[in-house]
A protein has these predicted regions:
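Flexible, polar/low-complexity N-terminal or interdomain linker segments that lie immediately upstream
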Residues: 1-43, 48-52
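Short hydrophobic/charged patches on amphipathic alpha-helices used for structural packing
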Residues: 32, 70-74
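Conserved beta-strand positions in the Rossmann-like core of class I SAM-dependent methyltransferases
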Residues: 43, 62, 109
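Short loop/helix-cap segments at secondary-structure boundaries that form the rim of catalytic
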Residues: 53-59, 76
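Glycine-rich, highly charged phosphate/nucleotide-binding loops
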Residues: 64-70
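Catalytic cysteine-centered active loop of the rhodanese-like fold, especially the PTP/DSP P-loop
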Residues: 73-118
């Protein structure tokens, strides 16, 4: 195959990717359970636009738009997980926020499917 092996054929990297995705994501059902049983153990962060947040959001979610994230690091906790969501499964805003937060040492999970899946 040579040094230009198709990345999709690299089963070791694929295994690591999917294992990490399972560890750092939560589905709507899992989030509903956390809200019901242990709402104080995490922060829920909606990174969508203001109008979308006002039109509807997940209970207990704080609004921190993606483009204002760095101005609001003080709202997050390093002592509990910060669950981030954006619009839908195709939206990358939550992942981009997760990168920024983890660079600063904040524990993060992503809601699979975003608000649309909720």
């Amino acid at each position: 195959m040579g040094e230009h092996m198709d990345v999709t054929m690299d089963t070791r990297r694929a295994h690591e990717y999917f294992l990490n995705e399972l560890c750092y994501s939560i589905g709507p059902k899992g989030l509903k359970e956390k809200i019901k049983n242990d709402v104080n153990s995490f922060n829920l962060i909606d990174v969508r636009g203001y109008d979308d947040y006002i039109d509807g959001h997940i209970p207990f979610a704080m609004h921190v738009p993606y483009d204002e994230l760095e101005e609001h690091f003080n709202m997050f906790s390093k002592e509990k997980v910060n669950i981030i969501y954006s619009y839908s499964i195709v939206c990358q805003l939550a992942k981009k926020c997760a990168v920024k937060l983890t660079e600063k040492g904040y524990p993060v999970m992503e809601l699979i499917g975003g608000f649309k899946a909720w």
